[in-house]
Amino acid sequence: MRALFFGTPAIAVPSLEALASIADVVGVVCQPDRPAGRGLELKAPPVKVKALELGVPVLQPEKVRTPEFAAWVAGAGADVALVIAYGRILPKAVLEAPRRGCMNLHASILPRYRGAAPITWAIVGGETETGISLMQMDEGMDTGPVYAVRRTPIGPDTTADELAIDLGALAARVVREDLRRAVDGELAPTPQDHEAATHAALLKKEDGRIRWERSARQIHDHIRGMTSWPGAFTTIDGKALKVLAAHVESEADQGGAPPGTVVMAGRSVVVVACGAGAIQIVRAQVEGRKPLAAADLVAGRTLQAGMVLGR
């Protein structure tokens, strides 16, 4: 089986390794190197690094909607193109170029959480289970028929970063156990129930803002879902305060304290009232400063009882 691989971030690396173990990978397509770090030096994406280790040719097109790129894909003579977290929408000419088209490893149990950020929105939505769906790609956004679904639980304190690692490993299992059967026609694709679909929109910075009027459980889910980017944040004295770690302190009423009020700020605990219940902030970072334990923020008088966050 000859295969092309489309992917960019770390979550896609295990799938590339798995594909290389069962197929002749004739090319890897990933996004271009991007400036990163304080020096803004160009950094290769994780998939490119792994592809070069495997000795596979890498292509990093700035644009995928060109006749030249479609011709390159067609000329590769691939039986299938496997896509996971590539980060670009592929045109029809590319989708149809391989003999069996393009198949996608999507990080949700389709048709739920179609779109660019399924891991984050599943956690924010309080889901207790997610998975990897192997699907045939069409011109829609994750709308094609599904060959296989593998499921995994989401723990009550699991963060988006942690879940991405789990799903990366699960996707590799799908590649090893299900991809060839899908390509060979042994797995029948099942159409999705489009009426049951939900959307996982591309994240914006504002999506990270904590809405203190929500319940403690909802805010906790929001914080752990936003860990990678943009981060869950509120404001204090006009500056952004990124909440890096927290847990539900109580689901009971906080004596009428307005949502966002710091109701307790001791040596080892900072508790903030929510619309229902309260959360304990464990670790946070004031804009322009290093991350600190909440107790250190209290000691430095950054957080004090009676303050109202998010004003």
Curated annotation (Swiss-Prot):
Keyword set includes Disulfide bond: no
Catalytic activity as recorded in UniProt: L-methionyl-tRNA(fMet) + (6R)-10-formyltetrahydrofolate = N-formyl-L-methionyl-tRNA(fMet) + (6S)-5,6,7,8-tetrahydrofolate + H(+)
A single Gene Ontology CC term: cytosol
Pfam families linked to this entry: Formyl_trans_C (PF02911), Formyl_trans_N (PF00551)
InterPro entries with a match to the protein in the record: Fmt (IPR005794), Formyl_trans_C (IPR005793), Formyl_transf_N (IPR002376), Formyl_transf_N_sf (IPR036477), Formyl_transferase-like_C_sf (IPR011034), GART_AS (IPR001555), Met-tRNA-FMT_C (IPR044135), Met-tRNA-FMT_N (IPR041711)
Matches recorded under CDD domains: FMT_core_Met-tRNA-FMT_N, Met_tRNA_FMT_C
Keywords, comma-separated and alphabetical: Protein biosynthesis, Transferase
Binding-site residues, (6S)-5,6,7,8-tetrahydrofolate: 108-111
Family: Belongs to the Fmt family.
Designated name of the protein: Methionyl-tRNA formyltransferase
